[in-house]
Structure formats: structure tokens, C-alpha cells
């Protein structure tokens, strides 16, 4: 037998010349480096163990050669011997994992080695503090029948259970707990993971198990308390070379793993080390991006260029909106947050993504949570473009030419696509004839087509302060479907003749061609009406018709619900401080009332037309509340009265076979028809009406099919409506946050919620909020308030009355 011994800090390995040892290449490769992964495992003890230094001398023998010299000599000797064995044998022999079988001949010895020491005060031991930590401690006194009080290495006194004890350091009695720090320091100086590898090679050849004390004798030359503990620590933290063969209480016996298993574990370790290195590089990238000024942060695209980086960022994104796809994704995000020194919360993930520049400061979290489509796929876009270039107008021969009419399209100034426009003339008998021209998307799209299915899936266009996500691909909507000023446009025109009292006397629905004359905003239309220009007599006629229609509806029991409405447009929303344009629209404004009345008139005519011809349509109705609205007559007309009335209104109802009275609007039936580019249910009404106009009753949808479509679309519309309201509220709060501190706002008291807490309407902002108001204030009173706190991300705004 060849025997080489290095004492205290180097190693002792007895290598037999018998066959069956590990391959020479494995030994040569392993002997030359210390594995960083093992040192990371030792960090669980909260220690940083240094590598064995080359200039270190053996304790107790100052004339002995250095550790590095011994190891070098050991490498040469053992390598030469193993090469000689390899040549003689001609091939490597495998070591069979039959340790347990061979142990049966000395089972009694095994049992003896597993005998646990009696617990008593003064013993030095290791115990498991939690899932990630083991600590050294000294037994102090009993705590109840089974537990013990200990002083741990951090100077903390605590109670432990016997099951927590992982090792009792042998031959140590009455240990002074103040010496724990010194013991740990000496253990730190004595640990060398490479020694474990040498021992594995010798024990594998002998197919022999080992206890910590026996390993200490092998690698340190003695089994004193310090060396025994170091050997235990090396074995207990090792995941490569040894596995537990038997265990009882705090005693364990270890067995060397087979060569093939060790090689596989080492391979996995190398993979893990590479992954850990890559992960740490990613963490460093996050830290660098976080520290960088806003103008120097990496663009969002840079985080998506690499698949692994994209996956990690994706896990944080999912964590931020509480929508992880798997527990693995959740754990990955948690690991990233922990590595960044952050709490494992959705808020931490969100703030991190904002800090690195991946998310803008004002990212719309609700939009991300809902996962609504914000772009059309390439397939849908291509299909839409094909419709523009290839589709023919099957209604061309049936279209009436209305290009001679003056046509007004009135909408908000940032409207992308225009669904409707208006015309009017006075007949010779004095009656007013009105045309409501509606865009004709069914000229291009047919039920069940690819583009139609996508529109149905979306249900509606999404209008947010920061962006618009159209139901149809933009090019098709803008260039094909939308009404465009000065161009011939396909439309479905609803014409109505009104009596002087506002009642409908004649009506028709036709496919048409129109040429829009004016594209007006509500503000410009109102200005033209106030100017009362002779050359805009048609606009004046429309306003007159709107007035008499409003009067007629009131006589039929209609309820006025006009109020103030906020509209916000954010310019450059990706900027940390984007420009916020806020508009307050009064629904009682002349132009807004005009458009509102004409849309209701169109809906009534379509419902009547559908009823007359038995056309299945999405008829909408709303039963009036059984509360007499005259009970609110004492309240100021406008937002205050409307707010109280709306509170008692019942929900809308739908019927798909015949009209339902719409009590709030004061009309016998109603069908939403004027926004087919923006709302899918309006489009279904177009499909049905146009099928009838083509000369038959072969409708695309039965009443039952319409009901099914409506259920799905209405659900989607509710989601979009909530998203729009949430986005609007966020930006109103952000707008108010930026205003001068202490600025006063006029507010109307709408109602009292509880005691003196009132629901308010801020007149200058068109925003509803709650605040405590002073004694004596009544519903309808005007008060002044100021903003106390405004946090849009937390959906928090607090107002205080200025007294």
C-alpha cells in the first residue's frame, strides 16, 4: 500500500493499489482546484472560509514541508501509481455501489457507531435553526421535559428540541459558550473541501463507509473535537461525493457515491455554476439600470433580446400584476427580488421594473392585468388589407346618392374614426327632415370572417387617456370604414320626418353614399350655433329638431341625466412627467345635446323598423324606477338632480325579438346603431338590417344567436368600461397631484354618504370624490375644497373643505 499523510490543514489519503479506483483523469482534474460551489454551501454557516494558503506550515512541526509541496508530491505519486494500474489492467473497472451488502458482516459495528450521546449541560453541539441555517451552541439547562436551553454562536439564548440537534462534538464537556467564536474561527481555518474529494477516492476503492470522526482521522491525522466537527461539517454540507448511509438522531454514517454518480453530479454542478454566474450577471444588470438616470436607462427592447433575460423580466412582470403562469415563475421572481434586496411583493416588482426603465412611471397596471389585446396580429392585419383592396360592394346598386346634402360630423377633437354624421332640411310643409348617416363597415366585413371574429372577440374599441386600441385594424377602419371629409363614403342613412311636436311621422333606412362637409368638434359646433350664421341654417335646423325631440321625450316620461364629464388626453405617456390635457364637458351643451338627441332618434327608428319587419336585433330597454322622479324636483337641475335620480334607476334590459320600452329615454324601443366601427353589437344590428335591405329574411343571426353574442360582448364591454374608468381616475388624480399646493376647487354637494361625509362633484375637473363637510351644508350647496393628499398609484385622493 502506498500511504501519504499531510497533517492539520492538508490531507491524509491512503490509496490502495487494488483495482476499481476512479479514473486517472477524474483524479488529476479534481486535485487541481477548490470548488467554489462547496464554499457557497459552507456560507450557510454564515462564515467565509478562505482557501488553504500555499505558505502555511503544519501545526506542531515548523520544519515540515509546506502544504502545497505535500499536495504536489501527493499528486505526482498517486497519479503515477494510478497510471501504472491503468496500464496493467487495460481498462477502467467500475465500482459497484454495494456498500450496504458488504456492511451486513459488521452490522453490530454499524449500530455501535450510531449510538447517541446523553444530553447534559456543557455539551458543544450543532443544531438546525431553520431551513437554511445550522448553528453551533452549548447546552445550558433543560427547558421542560425534553427541550433544552442553549447559547448559540451569536450569543442568543433559545430553546431547542432534541430533533433539531444535527451533531454533538465528541469529547467536549463543560464547554464555555464564550469560546464559541474562537472555536468557529479555528474551524474556519481548518476547512478545505478538496480534502473530502481525496477521502472519497480512497474510501471508494475500499467500498467503505465512514463516520465524521473516522474522516477526521483520515484527512487531519486525528479525531480531536475541532477536527471531528470540521469533518462532520464537510460531510453534512457535501452534495457530490458522499451520501448518508444510516442515520439515528444526531449520528450519521456516510457512504462514498459511485464514480458515475459523482461525475453526473459534478456535471450538474458545473451547469448550475454557469447558471448562477449568468443569474448574477443579470442581477448586476438590474442594479446598473436601476442606478442609471432616466435618460440613460436601457430601452425596453434590450430586455427582450435574450430569451433568458426575457423570461426573468417576464416573471417580474407577472409578479407585479399577480398573474404568474406557474409556481416556477413565481419562485424565479421571488429569487430576483430577494437578490435585489427587495421584499417579495407585487409593489416591489412593479417599482423595480419602473426603476430599470422597462415600465414607464405611469404604466397602466390594469391593462396588463386584463391582458386585453393592444395590437392586431399580422394575420388579421393582412386579412384587413385584403378587404380594402379586393372586396366589392354588393350593395352598390341599392345605394341612394345623398352627396348633395350638407353633412356635419361632430365628435371630440381626438377622434380617430368617425361613425356618424348628420344632415337636415325643412320640407315645404314646414316639417323638419333629418338624416343620421352611419358608417358602413358591413360593406367590407361579413359575419364569421376572420376580421369579424377578431372584432367579436374584442367586443369594443378601447379608449384610454394614453392610447386607443381599435376594434378593427387601423388602416381598414380609417381608410375604408370611417367617414372622411370631402370624400364619397359608404353609409347606412336613417331618415326621419318630425312633426312640430317632435313625434316621428315618416322614416326610412337605406344604403347610401354621402360626402361629409364639415368635421366639427363639440366646441366648434357650439360656437357655430351661437353665431347663428345664415349659411349654416342646416346646423340650426338640427339644433331645433334636437330641442323639440327633447321636449317630446320628456312628455313621454324621459328622465334628464345630464351631468359634467371629464375627458383626458395624455401626450407622451411614456415620459415621467407627460403633458395632461383635461377637458370638462357639460352634457347640457348645445352641440352635445344635439348629437345626443340624434343618436336616440336613430336608435328609436331602427327599433321601429326592426319591429315592423320582424328583424331579430339587440333591442335595449330600461324600466323606469317606481320612485316618482318629481320627488327630486327640489334639487338644483343638472348634476345634483341627475346624480340622485341615477341612483334609483334600474338596470337596462335586452330583448332580441321585439323592442322593449326604454323608460329613461322616454321612447318605445331602442337599438344602438350609430357606432358600428367601435361597438360589435352595433355591427350585428348593421348585419341584420342590411340583410333585410338586400331583399330577404335570411338574417345572419337568429334571436338566440344574438343573445349568445351579446352575453359575451357585454361581458367584455364591462371589463373595458371598468378599465377606462380606472385609467381616467388615475390621470385625474395625477393631474390634481401636480397642481399648486393649497389650490381651491369649487365642489357641488351631490349627497351625503354617512354623517357629514358627502359625495362631491368638482366643477372645474368634473371629478367625483368624498370629503367631510361642515355643519349646515346641504345637498346642492357649493363649497370650496383643497387637495390634502394625492397618490394615483394607490388610487388615493383626500380633500378638505376650506372654511
UniProtKB/Swiss-Prot annotation:
One of its GO terms (biological process) is rRNA processing. One of its GO terms (molecular function) is exoribonuclease II activity. SUPFAM superfamilies: Nucleic acid-binding proteins. Residues 399-694 form the RNB domain. The keyword Signal does not apply. Keywords: Chloroplast, Exonuclease, Hydrolase, Mitochondrion, Nuclease, Plastid, RNA-binding, rRNA processing, Transit peptide. Disruption phenotype: Shorter 3' nucleotide extensions of mitochondrial mRNAs and reduced accumulation of several chloroplast rRNA species. Germinates only on sucrose-containing media, with white cotyledons and pale green rosette leaves. GO terms for cellular component: chloroplast; mitochondrion; plasma membrane. It is an enzyme of class 3 (hydrolase). 3'-5' exoribonuclease that catalyzes 3' maturation of chloroplast and mitochondrion ribosomal RNAs; degrades short nucleotidic extensions to generate the mature 3'-ends. Involved in the maturation of 23S, 16S and 5S rRNAs. This is Ribonuclease II, chloroplastic/mitochondrial. The lineage of its organism: Eukaryota, Viridiplantae, Streptophyta, Embryophyta, Tracheophyta.
